Each structure stands twice: as C-alpha cells, then as structure tokens.
C-alpha cells in the first residue's frame, strides 16, 4: 500500500475531494490500475442487470472462481464515498476476492451521489441483496451463504 500512496503523491494530481464529482470520477477511473495486480482469469465473469424498486436496471458483474454449484456469494459495494467508483474501477479487486476466497462476487453499480441523493445507494444495495437471495440458485450460488461487503 505504501507504494500505491507514493505513486499517487508523485503524480501530483489535485486531491479527489477538491474536484467536481464528474472530474473526480474521471480521475478515479484513470487511476484504477494503480494496484498493478494482474487480472485473474476466472471460470465465470458475467454482466447482469438487477432491478431496483423503482424499475431502474442496475448494472452488476458476477465473478466466480469455478463453475461449481453452491458457492457462497458476496455482494460487493465498491468504494468511493457513494460518489465515485464503478464496476470497472474494482474489477481486478473483485476478481482477486473471488479467486482467493473461493466464492462468487457480485459487484454492483449502485447509483451515485450527488445526482442520486440518499437513500438511493442504500436502497440499491438492499434491492440487489433481495434479488440475489431470490435468484441465488439460478446463479448457482448457495442461498444460505450470502454476504455483503465492500471498501
């Protein structure tokens, strides 16, 4: 982590909190590769759409280390203060979580502030969890082993 922070400091860019949400998102996307971790090859990587309570179709990506049925499933909420971040910025991290933990990971593109005010992101997370619980077997996950996490 020290090397990541040092590279960020050397880049000399304005801190994210001093930028507009749009500019911060662009900068965050551009810096997504700062971890320099190779992209893990997984048995399954699938893009999904999960319905929110208001009919909005949330983009999501499922990562699975194997094609075995009955794997535990983690609903992953990317970091970024509910203002920045996306499936793309956390793709490598979610691949590593799936590979190292031996579980499915579903990364959710929840709606971001300030365009979508509270409680949009938490409602999106709850709606996604409910949908995953009711569709776990279709996804080949174990419905008794669901978790929520993120950074």
Feature annotation, model-predicted:
Residues 60, 70-80:
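Short beta-strand element of the alpha/beta-hydrolase
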Residues 116-138:
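Alpha/beta-hydrolase active-site loop
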Residues 76, 81-84, 89, 105, ...:
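Serine-hydrolase catalytic-loop signature spanning alpha/beta hydrolases and amidase-signature enzymes
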Residues 87-108, 123:
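Short amphipathic alpha-helix adjacent to the substrate-entry channel of hydrolases
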Residues 109-113:
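Short beta-to-alpha linker loops that shape the active-site pocket of alpha/beta-hydrolase fold enzymes
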Residues 1-58, 62:
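A glycine/proline-hinged amphipathic helix-loop "lid/cap" segment
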Residues 73, 102-104, 144-145:
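Structural signature of beta-strand start/N-cap positions in the alpha/beta core
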Residues 133-149:
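Gly/Ser-rich "nucleophile elbow"/oxyanion-hole loop immediately N-terminal to the catalytic nucleophile
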